[in-house]
Amino acid sequence: MGRSLIFSGNMSLRISHLPRSSLPLQNPISGRTVNRTFRYRCTRILSNSFKSTTRLQTKAVLSEVSDQTRYPRIGAKTTGTISPAHLLEVVELAAKTGAEVVMEAVNKPRNITYKGLSDLVTDTDKASEAAILEVVKKNFSDHLILGEEGGIIGDSSSDYLWCIDPLDGTTNFAHGYPSFAVSVGVLYRGNPAAASVVEFVGGPMCWNTRTFSATAGGGALCNGQKIHVSKTDAVERALLITGFGYEHDDAWSTNMELFKEFTDVSRGVRRLGAAAVDMCHVALGIAESYWEYRLKPWDMAAGVLIVEEAGGAVTRMDGGKFSVFDRSVLVSNGVLHPKLLERIAPATENLKSKGIDFSLWFKPEDYHTEL
């Protein structure tokens, strides 16, 4: 099963990304690092190509400067009795194990059932979650687990809560559309402590993956290399992402209006259909912001930490301090956060005035938090 999974080489998907990337070149088929002499020649060619440019406009940059200081941090202050390195090791292993199951199934016919009128679930969701659970239980048998398919499992008195989305973007997966992922995040006393998202890229017959990961206070990585949000400081130059839930209620209608509004004033708004992937794209610097109503803990637990550790900002859509147990999220590169809130927060407050509550809608009973 594992032989079918090719964890992505560190090549950017577009050649225009190469001048601003520090990721090592790898052969996308063998995964082996490209010959150093060849890499040196490529570097010289790229360097010479840009010598005449006095100012190179870039989006994603490697920088430790953060624009998130005005917003409360959401990451855990500590990982408790487990070291950050060990916790991240298991989180990544769990996500990659689930991704192996998905990779095995991605080009095969799928047996699709429905949880509602339009919320489909495949056998792959269930098999991926089972594989992830096996990894978590083997390493931390006393931890509490919240899975999208299996619900609550384990000891509710544990300080650790694993939030598992075994296949984020199931509809995309079912159609072979390249925007889906396996997402695993672990909370310590209610706050994100470690995260891993394995994103599927490519398309039918040429699927590949890249792995995003983060620990609280440890930075964000893509395929082991540090990443950072963009520095775009104007909405007019920003690429934005949102999502729509299955309930066509007032929140859905309000977000449709926000979608139209931001389409008029930004570079564009995308609706890709996988929350974890959307947030990782903000962390990578290829989009500036993502927002959505009606999300659940397993949708957000991994992605929000990766964004924050990449230098971004995370709040509720009304601007309040975010919790994984809330029902709305706005993530951004930090620079644009106040400008986005100027438009989004009033719409959210209007929904709240109608009795729609987006805060702390779901938390496992008896699970201790520091929120």
Swiss-Prot record:
Q: Which residues cross the membrane?
A: none
Pfam families xref list: Inositol_P (PF00459)
Q: Which keywords has UniProt assigned to this entry?
A: Acetylation, Chloroplast, Hydrolase, Magnesium, Metal-binding, Plastid, Transit peptide
| Top EC class of this enzyme | hydrolase
Binding annotation for Mg(2+) 1:
E148, D165, L167
Subcellular location(s) per record: Plastid, Chloroplast stroma
Coarse class of the protein's main subcellular location: plastid
Any GO BP annotation? inositol biosynthetic process
- Residues that hold Mg(2+) 2 according to the record: D165, D168, D299
Q: Could you name the domain of life of the organism this protein comes from?
A: Eukaryota
Which cofactors, by name? Mg(2+)
Q: Which residues carry this modification: N-acetylvaline?
A: V61
Q: Where does substrate bind?
A: E148, L167, D168, G169, T170, G273, A274, A275, E292, D299
GO terms (molecular function) for this protein are: inositol monophosphate 1-phosphatase activity; metal ion binding
Please state the Enzyme Commission number of this protein.
3.1.3.25
Q: So what does this thing catalyse?
A: a myo-inositol phosphate + H2O = myo-inositol + phosphate
Q: Which GO terms describe its cellular component?
A: chloroplast; chloroplast stroma
Question: PROSITE patterns, alphabetically?
Answer: IMP_1, IMP_2
Q: What does this protein do?
A: Phosphatase acting preferentially on D-myoinositol 1-phosphate (D-Ins 1-P).
Q: Which family does it belong to?
A: Belongs to the inositol monophosphatase superfamily.
The protein here is known as Phosphatase IMPL1, chloroplastic
Q: Which source organism does the UniProt entry give?
A: Arabidopsis thaliana
